[in-house]
């Protein structure tokens, strides 16, 4: 009778083990689409078998085993960081490309071409009032184009500053979730597949925002580092980041927009540690591309160089000429010359100039009635040293800036496409190891159900034998 009840107990243990295994499989199916979830594998542990000691063997359910591979997780995070970087660059640069219309139909290039054409028309009819009025009108259009372009660039900088700030806030928020995980780990308790899934989903989101390194410690906690160096979370302490704008060197240009920086909890500049993720892409455009166009404390920017060169050379040529009344010419353009970054945003037509004070005559010798107007008409393509910017004609320099921006945008877009493919491949490789296959789980459930049914039948048989024996007593 004792052996019968021992077999009943062994069968009950096996039944419970199969039940627990079925629950694990069901949990896998339920979380097949849960972000960060790794497939759990049920375990069955053999019980000791020794008839002399009354140990009849059997099985019991063990703790489910996770199939997560941290090496593969690290690979996904790395590729996700690269994608975030190139994606942020591509999106930001795509917003800047319309500023420089390569067709020459709009923007600075169109206005500049129109001004030079008005000079050409004026040179053909130097005494024409209509031609002179057209010169003044086209000069006003050019000033407005420069101001509009600088306004768009300034708005782009503001937008990126806001995105940098929101990204830093998101990083701090996600880091606080890692901190919460560490606090729970310190409290002990069994492994939690849901908590583990949330942690790895958080780490992947952090990688998309910035290049982070996650180190799993022996006590179960996670150490989080920015760029492998700057601590974000260590144990049960969080170190928050902040975004600030300031210049690190002595400013050469007054009234320039300061550089964007990332500062750690101790106030140290850790911008150099931001090497991937959305934050890196935003910083690249904010601190490199935009200053190259609108200038900063150390450089005037391409747009200001063009505005200053056009204004200075036009004014110099007009000042060297004579009006129809024999008076010296006056400047066509005004701009704020107190800082190299102010030329384009302040470029306007001299309010004192009129059609009568436009000087087309070159006093020579020899005197040429339309000499100044002709020189102005050819200014855009002139290779003379005083007419060039960095060795290029004004129009060639502007076209070059347009091409540079277009190439930067195309490169970022191409890199984004490659990075997206790499992320997809890394995720697919991870899914092969730790992803949930519904077909595989269906087969496992069928196998476990058969085992469960067998144990149920065994228990039913033992119960029947026990009842029979009890009736015989």
Predicted regions, residues:
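Structural signature of extracellular appendage/secretion-system components
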Residues: 1-473
């Amino acid at each position: 009778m004792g052996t019968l009840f021992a077999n009943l107990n062994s069968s009950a243990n096996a039944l419970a083990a199969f039940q627990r295994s079925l629950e694990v499989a069901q949990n896998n199916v339920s979380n097949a689409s849960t972000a960060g979830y790794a497939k759990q594998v049920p375990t069955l542990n053999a019980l000791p078998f020794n008839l002399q000691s009354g140990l009849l063997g059997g099985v019991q359910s063990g703790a489910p085993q996770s199939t997560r591979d941290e090496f593969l997780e690290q690979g996904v995070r790395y590729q996700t960081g690269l994608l975030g970087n190139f994606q942020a660059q591509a999106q930001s640069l795509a917003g800047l490309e319309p500023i420089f219309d390569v067709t020459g139909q709009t923007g600075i290039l169109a206005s500049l071409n129109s001004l030079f054409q008005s000079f050409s028309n004026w040179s053909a009819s130097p005494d024409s009032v209509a031609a002179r009025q057209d010169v003044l009108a086209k000069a006003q259009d050019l000033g407005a184009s420069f101001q509009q372009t600088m306004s768009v660039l300034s708005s782009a900088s503001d937008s990126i500053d806001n995105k940098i700030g929101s990204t830093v806030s998101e990083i701090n928020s996600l880091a606080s979730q890692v901190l919460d995980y560490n606090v729970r780990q310190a409290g002990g308790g069994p492994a939690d597949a849901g908590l583990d899934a949330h942690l790895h989903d958080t780490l992947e989101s952090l990688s998309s925002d910035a290049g982070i390194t996650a180190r799993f410690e022996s006590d179960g906690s996670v150490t989080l580092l920015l760029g492998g160096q700057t601590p974000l979370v260590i144990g049960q302490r969080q170190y928050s980041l902040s975004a600030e704008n300031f210049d690190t060197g002595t400013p050469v240009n007054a009234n320039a927009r300061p550089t964007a920086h990332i500062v750690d909890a101790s106030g140290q500049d850790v911008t150099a540690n931001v090497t991937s993720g959305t934050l890196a892409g935003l910083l690249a455009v904010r601190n490199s591309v935009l200053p190259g166009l609108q200038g900063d404390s150390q450089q005037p920017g391409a747009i200001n160089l063009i505005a200053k060169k056009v204004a200075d050379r036009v004014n110099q040529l007009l000042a060297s000429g004579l009006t129809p009344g024999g008076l010296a010419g006056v400047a066509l353009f005004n701009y704020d010359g107190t800082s190299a970054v102010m030329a384009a945003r302040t470029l306007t037509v001299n309010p004192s100039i009129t059609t009568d004070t436009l000087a087309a005559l070159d006093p020579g010798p020899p005197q040429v009635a339309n000499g100044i107007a002709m020189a102005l008409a050819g200014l855009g393509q002139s290779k003379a040293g005083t007419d060039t910017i960095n060795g290029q004609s004004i129009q060639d320099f502007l076209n070059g800036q347009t091409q540079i921006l277009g190439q930067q945008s195309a490169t970022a877009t191409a890199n984004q496409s490659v990075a997206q493919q790499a992320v997809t491949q890394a995720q697919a490789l991870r899914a092969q190891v730790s992803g949930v296959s519904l077909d595989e789980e269906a087969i496992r459930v069928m196998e476990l159900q058969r085992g469960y049914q067998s144990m149920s039948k065994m228990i039913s048989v033992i119960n029947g034998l026990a009842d029979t024996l009890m009736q015989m007593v």
